[in-house]
């Protein structure tokens, strides 16, 4: 069927280029270019993301407060009780 790995057939007219793993850097320019790029992207989309979260928070707090107030009894209804 075919040869085993390590003893494969030789292919002609195929050129491959590779870089040694010892010459590669794991995180090149991670702190000098990566973090500022993240901050730039966050600043660009903050006006698209933050307003819905603020609106949801305000609606949620208002709804929770109204729910708690609706569970309370009206003290004026029990003024004449002994």
From Swiss-Prot:
Annotated membrane topology: Single-pass membrane protein
Subcellular location: Mitochondrion inner membrane
Matches recorded under Pfam families: UcrQ
Top-rank lineage group of the source organism: Eukaryota
Transmembrane segments: 40-68
Biological process annotations from GO: cerebellar Purkinje cell layer development; hippocampus development; hypothalamus development; midbrain development; mitochondrial electron transport, ubiquinol to cytochrome c; pons development; pyramidal neuron development; subthalamus development
Modified residues (N6-succinyllysine): 33
Mitochondrial matrix side: 1-39
GO cellular component terms given for this protein: mitochondrial inner membrane; respiratory chain complex III
Stretches of the chain found on the membrane's Mitochondrial intermembrane side: 69-82
Entry-annotated residues carrying N6-acetyllysine: 33
Keywords from the named record: Acetylation, Electron transport, Membrane, Mitochondrion, Mitochondrion inner membrane, Respiratory chain, Transmembrane, Transmembrane helix, Transport
Primary localization class, coarse: mitochondrion
Family indicated by similarity: Belongs to the UQCRQ/QCR8 family.
Assembly and interaction partners: Component of the ubiquinol-cytochrome c oxidoreductase (cytochrome b-c1 complex, complex III, CIII), a multisubunit enzyme composed of 11 subunits. The complex is composed of 3 respiratory subunits cytochrome b, cytochrome c1 and Rieske protein UQCRFS1, 2 core protein subunits UQCRC1/QCR1 and UQCRC2/QCR2, and 6 low-molecular weight protein subunits UQCRH/QCR6, UQCRB/QCR7, UQCRQ/QCR8, UQCR10/QCR9, UQCR11/QCR10 and subunit 9, the cleavage product of Rieske protein UQCRFS1.
Function comment: Component of the ubiquinol-cytochrome c oxidoreductase, a multisubunit transmembrane complex that is part of the mitochondrial electron transport chain which drives oxidative phosphorylation.
Protein name, entry field: Cytochrome b-c1 complex subunit 8
Organism: Ailuropoda melanoleuca (Giant panda)
Gene designation: UQCRQ
